[in-house]
Amino acid sequence: MSAGTLFVVATPIGNLDDISPRALRVLREVALVAAEDTRHSIRLFQHFGIETPLAACHEHNEREEGGRFISRLQGGEDVALISDAGTPLISDPGFHLVRQAQALGIRVVPVPGSCALIAALSAAGLPSDRFIFEGFLPAKAAGRRSRLQAVQEEPRTLIFYEAPHRLLESLADMRDVFGGERRAVLARELSKTFETIRSLPLAELHDWVASDSNQQRGECVVLVAGWQAPEGEESIGAEALRVLDLLLAELPLKKAAALAAEITGVRKNLLYQQALQRQGKS
């Protein structure tokens, strides 16, 4: 008997009209749907008249319950994986189940659809050819600032998810770490009634959110323009700096700079000067 297929199905992030006909067909035809929160997903199913059984698959039970879904798949049944909203695995559960299925040779098929970070990026007015997604920042201030400092000189557009009750604190930390003039965008409640997309320098964006408690509600995506070197100064980039720091911990300064240049393609002299600064020898 051949194994079934695991379908990774995107669902709407707000507006139910955004679900695709293919997603509806798959959800109706599979034997079982693994859902992040069955209580949430049942409302989607009731709206569209889907009667497929639901079973919980969330961050607290995914490792233990994954075998249940794998057994159904190995028995020849098709299973769909959904999150509460958007595309599964994007800051949502499902990674362990997908990895286990892949390891066992079970076919995994994506059914594309809504994704908050992509929707936000498409309307943000920030460079979209190169970007990085950092997911949710740590809840505690020290961890949050450390994560932000790690991407302080990242030239690509930065994208974060944030819980509404931490939005103001995170914007304050972004302002302090990245600088108040760095351009940022708050994309809130996308595709819903109170959708908001606001682009301002970080200092102004923080103050605007602080002045209106309504902006501290709902699902939030924060996008920040990538770092730009001062005019006339060549950019190194966060990844090259990370490589340099790792090598400096193991090698003499000159060798570390030379090897970092070979790995990253950044000019050796530029990395050498940065290494001097990092070791306090400039």
Curated annotation (Swiss-Prot):
Record-listed E.C. numbers: 2.1.1.198
GO cellular component, as recorded: cytoplasm
InterPro entries assigned to the protein according to its UniProt record, in alphabetical order: 4pyrrol_Mease (IPR000878), 4pyrrol_Methylase_sf (IPR035996), 4pyrrole_Mease_sub1 (IPR014777), 4pyrrole_Mease_sub2 (IPR014776), rRNA_ssu_MeTfrase_I (IPR008189), RsmI_HTH (IPR053910), SAM_MeTrfase_RsmI_CS (IPR018063)
Keywords: Cytoplasm, Methyltransferase, rRNA processing, S-adenosyl-L-methionine, Transferase
Reaction catalysis annotation: cytidine(1402) in 16S rRNA + S-adenosyl-L-methionine = 2'-O-methylcytidine(1402) in 16S rRNA + S-adenosyl-L-homocysteine + H(+)
Subcellular location field: Cytoplasm
Record carries keyword S-adenosyl-L-methionine: yes
Top-rank taxon, per record: Bacteria
GO terms assigned for molecular function: rRNA (cytosine-2'-O-)-methyltransferase activity
Family: Belongs to the methyltransferase superfamily. RsmI family.
Function: Catalyzes the 2'-O-methylation of the ribose of cytidine 1402 (C1402) in 16S rRNA.
Protein name per its UniProtKB record: Ribosomal RNA small subunit methyltransferase I
Gene transcribed to yield this protein: rsmI
